[in-house]
Amino acid sequence: MRAVVQRVKEASVTVAGDIKGKIDKGLLVFVGIGEGDTEEDVRYLVDKIVNLRIFEDDTHKMNLSALDLNREILAVSQFTLYGDCRKGRRPNFTGAAKPRYAEKMYDTFVKFLKNTGLKVEEGVFQAMMEVNLINDGPVTILLDSNKQF
C-alpha cells in the first residue's frame, strides 16, 4: 500500500461539480492499494500517517503530528501510485489491486483513519475527481507499507 501525504492549508475533492470532501488545515492523502495488500498494510499506513511529525511546534521545528494537533485528513484513492514506468513511456499498473479488492481495502483504510478520532473526508472510489489544494510548506512525504521507499 502506498500513500502520498501532503501537508495542506486546505483541500477539497469534487466529482461532477459536487464537492465530496473538504478540509481545512491537515493532510491530503492519496492512497494506492497494491496487489496482495492486507489489513496489516492498512494498519501500518494509518498509524504512520496520523503520527507523522510534519507540523511545526512553537520553535518552527517539525515535531507535531496530525493527532497532536487534531488536524483533518482528506483521503483520495489513486491506483496510479502503482504506475511502473521502468520500461517504455506508458505506465504499467499491474501492481495495483483489482478494483473490487482495492475498494474494500480503501474503505478499511478510511474506517481506520476515522477510528483515530480525527475528522476524515474522502473522495469517491474509481471516480474522475478534481482535487484542489493549497500546500503548506510544501511538505510532501511518500510512504509504502512494504518499505520500498
Swiss-Prot record:
Keyword NAD: no
CDD domains found in the cross-reference section: Dtyr_deacylase
Enzyme class: hydrolase
GO MF annotation terms: D-tyrosyl-tRNA(Tyr) deacylase activity; Gly-tRNA(Ala) deacylase activity; Ser(Gly)-tRNA(Ala) hydrolase activity; tRNA binding
Catalytic activity entry: glycyl-tRNA(Ala) + H2O = tRNA(Ala) + glycine + H(+); a D-aminoacyl-tRNA + H2O = a tRNA + a D-alpha-amino acid + H(+)
Gene Ontology process terms (BP): D-amino acid catabolic process
UniProt subcellular location: Cytoplasm
Assigned keywords, A-Z: Cytoplasm, Hydrolase, RNA-binding, tRNA-binding
Record's function text: An aminoacyl-tRNA editing enzyme that deacylates mischarged D-aminoacyl-tRNAs. Also deacylates mischarged glycyl-tRNA(Ala), protecting cells against glycine mischarging by AlaRS. Acts via tRNA-based rather than protein-based catalysis; rejects L-amino acids rather than detecting D-amino acids in the active site. By recycling D-aminoacyl-tRNA to D-amino acids and free tRNA molecules, this enzyme counteracts the toxicity associated with the formation of D-aminoacyl-tRNA entities in vivo and helps enforce protein L-homochirality.
UniProt domain comment: A Gly-cisPro motif from one monomer fits into the active site of the other monomer to allow specific chiral rejection of L-amino acids.
Subunit structure: Homodimer.
PANTHER family, per the entry: D-AMINOACYL-TRNA DEACYLASE 1, D-TYROSYL-TRNA TYR DEACYLASE
NCBIfam families on file: D-aminoacyl-tRNA deacylase
Name listed for the protein in its UniProt record: D-aminoacyl-tRNA deacylase
Organism: Halothermothrix orenii (strain H 168 / OCM 544 / DSM 9562)
